[in-house]
């Protein structure tokens, strides 16, 4: 992950694998997270999915747009990629990441602040496999969209600058819709 996507010291820690699900932010951030959750931000799912969807494939389409026109870094909001990625993976779905140009997916550094970070984001920070997928995303134009059961669009400010203007994405979404694929986003 590029340096601009991991600007905080805690992003460089690599706890043992058995601690990933228990990784916790500092106490003030935990308190603020609880307050944010009580206000409806990143609520826990009262009825989590428990099925297995082995053999299915999902594509998460992310942005390459890394900078706002005012010179500030932007990209996708981390939880809008990490939450569906881990939920799909835990259900047994094979997940690929794609972007309009392929290669580096821009991640908004503000989405890693302790208060707004989810436990899925905490997991991403120590997950070398997903971090490698973020660095080497697939180019949408090169994909066989028919090979995927789900096409999901991850949001964030960067997505507003390139996802809606990509001819390749428009073509692939049209093909996915015609084939009856599940298409969603946030």
Segments (PLM) and residue ranges:
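Short, glycine-/small-residue-rich phosphate/pyrophosphate-handling segment
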Residues: 183-186
């Amino acid at each position: 992950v590029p340096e601009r996507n991991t600007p905080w010291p805690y992003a460089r820690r690599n706890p043992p694998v058995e601690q990933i699900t228990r990784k916790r932010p500092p106490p003030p951030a935990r308190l603020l997270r609880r307050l944010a959750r009580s206000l409806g931000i990143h609520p826990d799912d009262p009825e989590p999915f428990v099925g297995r969807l082995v053999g299915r494939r999902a594509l998460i389409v992310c942005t390459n747009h890394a900078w706002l026109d005012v010179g500030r870094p932007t990209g996708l909001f981390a939880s809008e990629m990490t939450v569906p990625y881990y939920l799909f993976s835990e259900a047994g779905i094979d997940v690929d990441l794609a972007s309009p140009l392929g290669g580096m997916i821009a991640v908004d550094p503000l989405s890693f602040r302790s208060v707004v970070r989810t436990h899925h984001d905490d997991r991403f920070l120590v997950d070398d496999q997903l971090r490698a997928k973020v660095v080497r995303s697939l180019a949408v134009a090169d994909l066989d969209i028919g090979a995927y059961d789900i096409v999901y669009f991850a949001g964030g400010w960067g997505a507003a600058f390139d996802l809606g203007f990509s001819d390749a994405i428009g073509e692939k979404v049209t093909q996915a819709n015609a084939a009856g694929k599940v298409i969603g986003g946030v």
